[in-house]
Regions:
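M16 family metallopeptidases and their MPP-like homologs
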Residues: 1-45, 65-75, 163-193, 197-325, ...
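Short alpha-helical segments and helix-capping/turn motifs at coil-helix boundaries
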Residues: 39, 50-59, 152-155, 172-174, ...
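Long, compositionally biased intrinsically disordered regions
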Residues: 35, 42, 55-142, 279, ...
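His/Glu-based metal-binding/catalytic segments typifying zinc-dependent metallopeptidases
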Residues: 10-30, 34, 96-189, 193, ...
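A diffuse structural propensity rather than consistent per-protein peaks
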Residues: 49, 129-132, 201, 263, ...
């Protein structure tokens, strides 16, 4: 973490400067003590075998008397009780008001709505400083993608400074894996590194991964490539110091080829965890689920995503969880068949990011990994996804909704242009924001237009339904009547570039 210094969208220089103030404000001669910490790490390493950390754990955790135990128990129907209590409270308050006081509240509400709909004056808006478009760099930084080969497998080398960290991704093309196995492939990505292997319990494996690497994970990703075209990938990735690359690949082999996919008790535990997490995801980030579900009616890309992480996957996991004993054999067979079809040499591409060492430094490790892959089989046709227009609604226990609608403008004969990125900014921070958020509607509202044509509107934590759809319906009228002066258009364009032109970390290459 220290060497990576990954601050997300914020520039490193800015974040280092803020860190310096933690000491610099109090000692003019020590601006760098919170940045130069290699010496501290060296001292901590020397204490590993001296009982230092065990002493800290015993003193501040095990023998610490300052603790509390909190038990949270669910109560069926609690939300209905709270809703009724609130309704009774509001009714009692209204009954306590005189007729004049009620009229006053109604009038104040009307005034509030009027103020929400009232636009700021031009003079007020021009008090806000705006940079010039000429201040924005127009050239795009070129990406470093040097193609080579190791062990007969294509390697993409991204030459960026990584502070002696190697970032390795082993990507496997899943285009030939049939749709009935896709949920099992998604589940496979979830369980790798958290099930027992031939040589480790899953707890020991987790410790070994943490000691020797910056993490090992498996993910499924799907990338749109053209209108109604996509590329599904199964990715094993790790990051480690150059000096630990041999151990990192040993662990990658252990995870990919030695994982026990038939441990019944452990599989049931993991399925329960995934089921719970998916339920939480559907309620806390339901706007993403709603938007992708709506796009899945016409987009093969979105329909595939549904099968691996959306409502469709939730329904699959729910069945596994509720009928586990009956489904167990199917789950194990599905996992093993998915792994066999994925882990073939002909599917594999390696992505490596690092500058101090060329890819050849891990040649022996890559070749050893390739030896463990399944023998290449004749592949079937590229997977096809069937889209079904359903127009659905899903009930949850929450008191708010996530309202989405979607379509594809390329299917209507229109082409993508960069102006749609600016329109997305205008919609999100002007039209949708004012018509929905400011006027007491959803807590959030957003839209997107992809270069494949997929488009959507969606709200976040929305108390309304029909009202939000009416706003969506009038979006075209808003664009037809849209007018803005040079200053406003400059703000929209600058805001659009600001959302795109962010630091990209080596780990993201």
């Amino acid at each position: 973490k220290y060497r990576e210094a990954n601050f997300g969208r914020f520039p490193k220089g800015l974040m280092y400067g803020l860190q310096m103030y933690d000491s610099w404000l109090y000692d003019d001669e020590k601006p760098f003590i919170h940045i130069k910490t290699n010496e501290i790490f060296r001292q901590l390493r020397e204490e590993i075998d001296n009982g230092y950390f065990e002493k800290l754990i015993k003193e501040y955790l095990i023998d610490n008397n300052h603790k509390s135990i909190v038990v949270m128990k669910p109560k069926k129907g609690l939300q209905k009780i709270k809703d009724q209590e609130e309704a009774d409270k509001l009714k009692a308050y209204k009954d306590s008001l005189s007729e004049e006081e009620v009229k006053k509240l109604v009038e104040e509400t009307k005034q509030l709505k009027a103020s929400q709909e009232e636009a700021s004056t031009k003079e007020e808006l021009e008090k806000i400083p705006v940079i010039d478009i000429e201040d924005i760099r127009k050239d795009v930084k070129p990406l470093s993608n040097v193609e080579s080969e190791l062990g007969g497998v294509k390697v993409l080398w991204h030459q960026y400074f990584t502070n002696k960290i190697a970032y390795v991704k082993l990507a496997f093309d899943m285009s030939h894996v049939p749709m009935d196995l896709v949920p099992y492939a998604s589940f496979l990505a979830e369980i790798l590194t958290i099930v027992d292997t031939t040589h480790y319990s899953y707890q020991e494996l987790g410790n070994e991964i943490s000691i020797e690497t910056g993490g090992i994970s498996a993910t499924m990703d799907v990338m749109p490539t053209d209108v109604h075209e996509f590329l599904p990938m199964f990715i094993l990735k790790t990051k480690c110091f150059y000096s630990n690359i041999e151990k990192a690949f040993e662990l990658l082999k252990e995870v990919a080829f030695e994982s026990k996919l038939d441990h019944k008790k452990r599989l049931k535990e993991i399925i329960g965890q995934i089921y719970t997490n998916l339920k939480i995801t559907l309620t806390e980030t339901g706007h993403k689920s709603a938007a992708n579900r709506a796009m899945s009616y016409f987009s093969e890309y979105a329909a595939y995503r549904e099968a691996i992480q959306g409502i469709t996957m939730y329904e699959t996991v729910k069945k596994w969880y509720e009928d586990f004993d009956e489904e167990y054999d199917n789950i194990v067979n599905g996992l093993k068949e998915a792994a066999r079809m994925i882990f073939e040499k002909q599917n594999m591409t390696i992505s490596y990011t690092g500058k101090e060492e060329a890819p050849e430094f891990m040649k022996a490790e890559v070749e050893s990994f390739i030896e463990g892959l399944y023998e290449d089989q004749k592949q079937g046709k590229k997977v096809k996804v069937t889209c079904t227009k359903s127009n659905e609604g899903f009930a949850t226990a929450g008191g708010v909704q996530y309202v989405a609608c979607a379509g594809n403008f390329k299917d209507a004969g229109l082409e993508y242009t960069g102006a749609l990125k600016v329109l997305q900014m205008i919609f999100s921070y002007e039209y949708l924001w004012i018509q929905i958020r400011v006027k007491g509607g959803a807590y959030g509202c957003m839209c997107s237009f992809s270069d494949q044509g997929d488009s959507m509107f969606v709200t976040y934590r929305d108390p309304n339904l029909a009202e939000s759809y009416k706003v969506y319906d009038k979006a075209a009228d808003y664009v037809a009547d849209f007018d803005a002066d040079d200053r406003d258009m400059k703000k929209y364009i600058i805001g659009t570039i600001g959302s795109m032109d962010m630091p990209m970390e080596a780990v993201d290459m």
